[in-house]
């Protein structure tokens, strides 16, 4: 398991020098954030980013993400040109040594939360999702949430939502099918493994279809193009927001088949209504057994990339919600510690 850390470029409050100091940290996960969605990432920009990261003793082998344009998700006539551009970006990334590209197929909105600073009893703050609050939001009035790859003006958002009114889950599946059949051969040629990120949260929101929510959906994605280049970002926190998803079982099934290319490891406290908040990575603090999840990766021989995903804001830190240094660093060390214990004493855990 190669431990990595998300970095948002020069505007990120967390400097590369600090990331390098996290024990066991080998790489950075990043992207080029100022190229408009749908345009080709220039190879010189990719090289520059890679050189900057490597100068701090870290690798750039995972990109998160190359956003998929809404016209591709909607199946508009412009999608063919956009897919060609996407493929050229993959070729440029592959030429620079990138191995994995994380992406998602969520309509309009990326990961969604209703609070960025929910207070916890210990004084830290965290990201939270309240189902009722989402139901009461009027997205047509224009809202901006973290994690989006684009910020829409109210009129743009209204137009997009109108476009999606005519698209159900079957239509979105058809458009994902079209995209993957076109792009996976290009990715394979470029030496890149595509890794789809599950929907976060794993259910429809704002009346929009969501199709990567559970085991059946993950299997269906892989069946579209049955090739190792078509794989998964298995996000424990996203899928774990649905109590019906057995995360260790998913890791064992898809990991044993070599189809998990990127592991997002975080814990969430979830209730039956679908409300959740993010916790520390420690198993006891959330609904997920993180030790068992890491054990599943270990037992399936996982050699891919992992990151501690989101973290709380602790010790007075300010910055990008969910992406501070301190709690994610603690998470990385905790996860690597579980792995080291399994590696040094495998017989102690074999019968558990």
Curated annotation (Swiss-Prot):
EC number in record: 4.2.1.8
UniProt GO BP: D-glucuronate catabolic process
Cofactors: Fe(2+); Mn(2+)
Enzyme class, first EC level, given as a word: lyase
Catalytic reaction(s) noted: D-mannonate = 2-dehydro-3-deoxy-D-gluconate + H2O
Pathway where it operates: Carbohydrate metabolism; pentose and glucuronate interconversion
Highest taxon above the source species: Bacteria
Alphabetical UniProt keywords: Iron, Lyase, Manganese
MF terms (GO), sorted A to Z: ferrous iron binding; manganese ion binding; mannonate dehydratase activity
Pfam family, one: UxuA
Name of the protein described by the UniProt record: Mannonate dehydratase
Organism: Paraburkholderia phytofirmans (strain DSM 17436 / LMG 22146 / PsJN)
């Amino acid at each position: 398991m190669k431990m990595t850390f998300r970095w948002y470029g020069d505007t990120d409050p967390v400097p590369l020098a600090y990331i390098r100091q996290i024990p066991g940290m080998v790489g950075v996960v990043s992207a080029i954030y100022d190229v408009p969605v749908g345009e080709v990432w220039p190879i010189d920009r990719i090289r520059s980013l890679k050189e900057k990261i490597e100068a701090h003793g870290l690798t750039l082998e995972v990109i998160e993400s190359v956003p998929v344009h809404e016209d591709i998700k909607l199946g508009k006539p412009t999608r063919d040109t956009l897919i060609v551009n996407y493929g050229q970006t993959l070729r440029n990334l592959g030429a620079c040594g990138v191995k994995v590209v994380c992406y998602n197929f969520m309509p309009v909105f990326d990961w969604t939360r209703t609070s960025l600073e929910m207070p916890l009893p210990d004084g830290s703050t965290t990201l939270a999702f309240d189902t009722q609050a989402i139901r009461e939001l009027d997205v047509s009035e224009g809202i901006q949430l973290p994690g989006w790859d684009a910020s829409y003006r109210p009129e743009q958002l209204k137009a997009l939502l109108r476009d999606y009114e005519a698209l159900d889950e079957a239509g979105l599946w058809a458009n994902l099918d079209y995209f993957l059949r076109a792009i996976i051969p290009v990715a394979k040629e470029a030496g890149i493994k595509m890794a789809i990120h599950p929907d976060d949260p794993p259910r429809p929101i704002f009346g929009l279809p969501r199709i990567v929510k559970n085991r059946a959906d993950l299997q269906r994605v892989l069946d579209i193009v049955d090739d190792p280049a078509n794989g998964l970002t298995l996000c424990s926190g996203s899928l774990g927001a649905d109590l019906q998803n057995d995360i260790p079982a998913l890791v064992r099934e898809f990991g044993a088949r070599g189809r998990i290319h990127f592991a997002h490891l975080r814990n969430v406290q979830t209730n039956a209504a679908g409300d959740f908040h993010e916790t520390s990575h420690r198993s006891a603090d959330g609904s997920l057994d993180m030790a068992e999840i890491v054990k599943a990766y270990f037992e399936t021989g996982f050699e891919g990339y992992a990151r501690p995903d989101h973290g709380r804001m602790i010790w007075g830190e300010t910055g990008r919600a969910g992406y501070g240094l301190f709690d994610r660093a603690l998470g990385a060390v905790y996860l690597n510690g579980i792995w080291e214990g399994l590696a040094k004493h495998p017989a102690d855990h074999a019968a558990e």
